[in-house]
Every structure is written in C-alpha cells, then in structure tokens.
Amino acid sequence: MRSIVRISLFLTLLTLSGTNIFGHDKQDTIKTPPQGRTAVMIEPAFTINPAKTAVLIMDYENDIVDMLPEDVRGPLLERAGTILKGARQAKLQIIYVVVRFRDGYPEVNLQNKLFSGLKQSGRLVEGTPGAEIDSRVAPQPGDIVVTKRRAGAFSTTDLETILRSKNISKLVLFGISTSGVVLSTVRWAADMDYSLAIVSDACADRDPEVNRVLMDKVFPWQATVVTSREFLKAIGAQDIK
C-alpha cells in the first residue's frame, strides 16, 4: 500500500511540475513553461490533404438548431453553409452525423440522464420534421449521413467503418452542441489517433461560457482549433460567399 501511495504522489508531483514522463523529444507539441507562466501549445501549420480528410457536420437538425437564439442561429448556419460549400469545392468527403430515435424511443434507457427526458419531449423522432437536417445546410449527392443514438458520432454508428474504408485519417468537425456531440466525438476520435481540427465558429452551445472553456482550454490538447476562415484558406477555397 505504501509503495502505491509513493508512486501516486510521485506522478502527481511530476504532473504539477510540468515534467515530461512520456519520453517525447524536443519536437513535442508542449513546452514546459518557466515558473509562474502558463503552459502553451506549439501548433503545427494547419494543412489539409483532401484525399485523407473528412468534414463532419454534427447534429444540425431542426429540433436542435431551433433551441439556439435567433441571433446565434442565423450566423451559425451561414458559416456552416460556407464551410460545406468550400469543402465540396475542394472535394472533401462530407459526413453528416444526426441523432434520431424510433417512435416511442426504444433505444433510450431511463438511466441515461442525457436522453431520458426526450420521451416526454417528442423531439428527434425519425420521420418528423424536427429530426431533419436544417434545409440551409442540407446534404447533397455524394455526402454521407450517419445516424446515432447517443451523444458521440462514433458510439452506436458505423462511422469508424466508413472512415477506415475511405482511408480517412484527419477529421474537421463542428456541431451543436459543443459540450455534447463535439466533446464526445473529439474524445473518442483522439483516442483512435485521428488528426483533428475543430471549426470553432461553426460550433454552438446553450452556455457560451462552456463553449469558451472547451475551445480555449480543453480542445487544444487534442485538436487544432480553427475558424471557418482559416479552414477555407487551408483548403484553398475561392470566392465562397
């Protein structure tokens, strides 16, 4: 027991001191800061190989989009549409991820705190207008639609099979909400060693502070956080309006 405690304290002290215990070399993406300063990331140049990249637009369904304030909803959809237009111009694979349930919600366990409330709401039921993707960012021929039953894009779907079959190794993703589908998908994809980019101004959350903390403090450890303008520049999109 004492040995376990000593090891635990040792690892804790190393973590707090910023010491690297994972054997990375000098080109690691994290620098140990001088005393009294905040750790900073060293981001590589943001580049995209269209043949190896997929764009994931997640949970842009009417029932979800309509929960956002109008002053957020309109600009968000406009930016999302611009991103998709640029991605199609650059011939990137676009994948829509949607959350839908059968009538009566047989997929929802009452112990699932996130989804159990849906049974009373009537939202996101297959075949209803609310479960459809917003017409302003509707899929086009060649796009793929993946249906999920839980928060993340990988859980309960065949997304991983699709990505592997297309030899996709980089994901550019955005969605609603930041603390829901985006967070869940980033965590899962990072653990599977995908290269990740998050388009920050095409994500939204009902709590702006949660959105800010995730974008500024959490996601940069596992993904490159970019704006829609930076993404379009990286893919060489021209005359996108």
Question: Where does each model-flagged region fall?
Answer:
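Short acidic, Gly/Ser-rich segments with clustered Asp/Glu that frequently serve as metal-coordination loops
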Residues: 62-66
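Von Willebrand factor
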Residues: 86-107
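Bacterial N-terminal signal peptides
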Residues: 8-18
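Active-site loop/turn elements of alpha/beta-hydrolase fold enzymes
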Residues: 60, 99-101, 201
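Active-site-adjacent betaalpha module
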Residues: 22-54, 82-90, 114-241
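Bacterial N-terminal signal peptides that target proteins for export
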Residues: 1-8
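…and closely analogous acidic/polar surface helices at protein-protein or active-site interfaces
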Residues: 68-87
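Short, flexible, mixed-charge acidic loops at enzyme active sites
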Residues: 107-114
